[in-house]
Swiss-Prot record:
Cofactor: Zn(2+)
Membrane topology of this protein: Multi-pass membrane protein
GO terms, biological process: mitochondrial protein processing; mitochondrial protein quality control
Subcellular location: Mitochondrion membrane
The gene coding this protein: yta12
Organism field: Schizosaccharomyces pombe (strain 972 / ATCC 24843) (Fission yeast)
Primary role: Catalytic component of the m-AAA protease, a protease that plays a key role in proteostasis of inner mitochondrial membrane proteins. Possesses both ATPase and protease activities: the ATPase activity is required to unfold substrates, threading them into the internal proteolytic cavity for hydrolysis into small peptide fragments. The complex is necessary for the assembly of mitochondrial respiratory chain and ATPase complexes. The m-AAA protease carries out protein quality control in the inner membrane of the mitochondria by mediating degradation of mistranslated or misfolded polypeptides.
Chain residue ranges for the region called Disordered: 83-119, 752-773
Subunit and interaction comment: Component of the m-AAA protease complex.
Comp. bias intervals (Pro residues): 761-773
Protein name: Mitochondrial inner membrane m-AAA protease component yta12
Top-rank EC class of the record's enzyme: hydrolase
Family matches, as CDD domains: RecA-like_FtsH (cd19501)
Catalytic activity: ATP + H2O = ADP + phosphate + H(+)
Biased amino acid composition, Low complexity: 87-101
Length: 773
């Protein structure tokens, strides 16, 4: 059945023509119902809406008359009572309302709209004030009215002393004067005196001066002292002035509240505003939260993952452990170098656990206000108890967990220590809970308070170290899943794991991402091994500076410097395998030699001496070929490495026969007094100097023996800029000390195609071994 009702907005000429042609002349409807009136603008007020209603009525009456509608077609206009007054800004509005029959047909829908209010909006939000022209004008009007009402001088006219004397005092119209607040005189005229303003006042500088002038003026007028104009003195408190005096304070308080609300809103946690500053900023995750990281995404830290999974299993099924009398540890600290996966493990725990997971940073407990830290700790654990069983993760706990009393020589740590004390109480105090587990992450477990590490609080300390070659291979496989690689992922991961000794999980993720970016930059459809190798160089050595042009003299010096490193490393026994030598500037370095260190946890005396000799080989080569007068500053970084190794050799490893097996701290910045005598310090300095000198002379002797081979390496570098292990082997011959842990020749043969595609490396025939000098 067709709907017999027509809904339209406020009538226009086009609307009237349509009604007359389609309905009125055909006698197809009997009445018009104006259900609602809207202005569809920001100036929507009751006055404008009722004005629109009147306009609509007049328009319909004019429509019926002007269109020549017969008397029998006179149509009554029925005005509905469904009007709503709103000051809320409306952009779209509504097109009218249905008739009674249509309303009965859609009764439930209309009821819902009534509950929501006008236009379906929430009635609680109807009276939001919009910042527009009417609002500003209304505010100015209200301020003006308040000023007139509250200001005592608002209805008074200010005059000068001359006006006062000529118009009032000389004519004898002044009944009395009132000195207000010692700076203003109010003129009270005699009764019956007609004046334009009614009341007048003038300002004075001082009361004594005013009294003298008034007395002199009255004497000049011949007024006897007994008939002088009486003067009264009193103080008045202006309501407006009082309010204005509080205005700066109120403005500051309002600004603080506004900024705190914005800050809390941006943080997305805790109660808004300054009144919620003691609330915890922890974010809660549960099984309904979209966390995509799972334990399957964490690789290379199998032992730590197993420890964490044990906590999760206990919270999921505590009865399995309790039947054996076991108690879950209260907490665990995840420690290790940056980028090893501490926070990633916590994210995986949040993604796997079916219990609530609260995550917070240690720095979020500390604010500029006293007492905020302990309050947030209490609120954090109160939230955890409400959601028990629950897991709490505090990242960078060393921000609040440093040992008490440290660093207090130059300032107070009361607030941080109070926060730490509250954390200790919450973890193992009278109100502690057995179903709350606390995880914490830190890079510096050595600075934490012993009370925090004792059993009953953080029972377990899980150290997450840099992954070994097997761990790196697993991590590469995880990240290579999302990359379109040219070769088999397992083969790529195995090779890259060998090339990235000492890399953390974050470094490996960066290498994979950089490799994909390099492939995209070169318009490649797939990521090849050469792209990953370039990414490793990008991460370890820095960005290649092709725009940095060296002079021929500088380039020759850099080539001989890097050739010295390569030759020394080739003929020294305990040196890491050489992969590549380059004189292309990268980052702050003008050249570099790339080595392949193995996973090693102990260093012998011979290894330290060989490492020192190889680091000094660059300076030694410059001295051999250019003389002592032309050595450069390019070896400054090498000297720093050598000095650190020599200091550790003498003061930490106990390898110096003179100093003996005694450990001395070299870094004494945190202490005022050195823990050893001046004689001991002098002996340490002398031993370090002797050790470095011995390494220098030993390296110089080695390079002089292979001077011709060094020169050949330098010339090849000047020709090609980059040479690899196989080319060095072609020039210098087989290495005297074979690498036992891997086959370098086979490893480098897998990437020989790289040199074939590099325009800097044209193919060259192998040359016979050069005779040694």
């Amino acid at each position: 059945m067709r709907n017999p009702f027509l809904t339209f907005r406020a009538p226009t000429r086009k609307t009237g023509d349509y009604l007359v042609s389609k309905f009125v002349k055909k006698d197809n409807f009997s009445s018009l119902r104006l259900a609602r009136a809207y202005t569809f603008s920001t100036r929507s007020t009751a006055v404008s809406q009722f004005s629109l209603l009147s306009l609509s009525q007049r328009s319909f009456q004019s429509l019926k008359i002007n269109k020549g509608i017969p008397e029998k077609h006179k149509i009554p206009l029925i005005s509905s009572k469904q009007f709503s007054v709103t000051s809320k800004r409306s952009q779209n509005g509504s097109s009218g309302s249905n008739s009674d029959a249509n309303g009965r047909k859609n009764g439930q829908k209309n009821d819902d709209s009534k509950k929501k209010g006008l236009n379906g909006n929430d009635p609680k939000k109807v009276f939001e004030i919009a910042l527009n022209g009417n609002t500003i004008l209304g505010g100015i009007l209200v301020a003006y009215i308040l000023y007139n009402v509250l200001s005592p001088n608002a209805n008074m006219q200010e005059i000068t002393w001359q006006d006062f004397r000529q118009q009032f005092l000389d004519k004898g119209l002044v009944e009395r004067l009132v000195v207000v607040n010692r700076n203003m005189v109010r003129v009270i005229l005699r009764g019956g005196v007609a004046s334009g303003s009614g009341q007048y006042y003038f300002s004075i500088g001082s009361i004594d001066s005013f009294d003298r002038k008034l007395e002199d003026a009255q004497r000049q007028l011949g007024i006897p002292p007994s008939e002088f104009v009486p003067v009264a003195y009193h103080d008045e408190v202006s309501v407006l002035a009082t309010l204005l005096s509080f205005a700066p304070t109120l403005l500051i308080i309002g600004s603080v509240i506004y900024l705190s609300r914005r800050a809390s809103g941006a943080a997305g946690g805790g109660q808004g505003g300054i009144f919620g500053i003691g609330k915890s900023r922890a974010k809660m995750f549960n099984h309904e939260t979209d966390i995509k990281i799972k334990f399957a995404d964490v690789a290379g830290v199998d032992e730590a993952k197993e420890e964490i999974m044990e906590f999760v299993k206990f919270l999921k099924n505590p009865k399995f452990y309790e039947r054996l009398g076991a108690k879950i540890p209260r907490g665990a600290i995840l420690s290790g170098p940056p980028g090893t996966g501490k926070t990633l493990l916590a994210k995986a725990t949040a993604g796997e656990a079916n219990v609530p997971f609260l995550s917070v940073s240690g720095s979020e407990f500390l604010e500029m206000f006293v007492g905020v830290g302990p309050s947030r700790v209490r609120d954090l654990f109160a939230t955890a108890r409400k959601n028990a069983p629950c897991i709490i993760f505090i990242d960078e706990i060393d921000a609040i967990g440093k040992a008490r009393g440290r660093g207090g020589q130059f300032g107070s740590n009361d607030e941080r220590e109070s926060t730490l004390n509250q954390l200790l109480v919450e973890m193992d105090g009278f109100t502690s809970s057995e179903h709350i587990v606390v995880f914490a992450g830190t890079n510096r477990p050595d600075v934490l308070d012993p009370a925090l590490l004792r059993p009953g609080r953080f029972d377990r300390q899980i150290t997450i170290d840099r992954p070994d070659i097997g761990g790196r291979e697993q991590i590469f496989k995880v990240h290579l899943k999302h990359i379109k690689a040219a070769d088999n992922i397992d083969l790529i991961a195995k090779r890259l794991a060998v090339l990235t000794s000492g890399f953390t999980g974050a470094d490996i993720m960066n290498v994979c991402n950089e490799g994909a970016l390099i492939a995209a930059r070169s318009n490649s459809n797939e990521v090849q091994m050469v792209h990953f190798e370039q990414a490793i160089e990008r991460v370890t050595a820095g960005l290649e500076k092709k725009s940095r042009v060296l002079s021929p003299e500088e380039k020759n010096t850099v080539a001989h410097h890097e050739a010295g490193h390569a030759v020394a490393g080739w003929f020294m026994e305990y040196v890491d395998p050489l992969l590549k030598v380059s004189i292309i500037p990268r980052a702050q370095a003008l050249g570099y030699a790339s080595y392949l260190p193995k996973d090693q946890y102990l260093m012998s005396r011979g290894q330290i001496l060989d490492q020192m000799g190889m680091a000094l080989a660059g300076r030694v080569s410059e001295e051999i070929f250019f003389g002592p007068e032309k050595i450069t500053s390019g070896a400054s970084d090498d000297f720093q490495k050598v000095t650190r190794m020599a200091q550790a050799y003498v003061t930490q490893y106990g390898m110096s026969p003179t100093v003996g097996t005694i450990a001395y701290p070299i870094d004494t910045r945190e202490t005022v007094q050195k823990p050893f005598s001046e004689a001991t310090a002098q002996m340490i300095d002398e031993e370090i100097r002797k050790l470095v000198k011995h390494a220098y002379e030993r390296t110089k002797k080695l390079l002089l023996e292979h001077k011709q081979g060094l020169e050949n390496i330098a010339q090849r570098l000047l020709q090609k800029e980059v040479i690899t292990y196989n080319e060095v082997e072609t020039i210098l011959g087989p290495r005297p000390y074979a690498y036992k842990h891997l086959n370098i020749s086979e490893l480098m043969r897998q990437s020989e195609y790289k040199n074939d595609h590099d325009p800097r490396n044209p193919p060259i025939p192998p040359s016979p071994q050069q005779p040694s000098a």
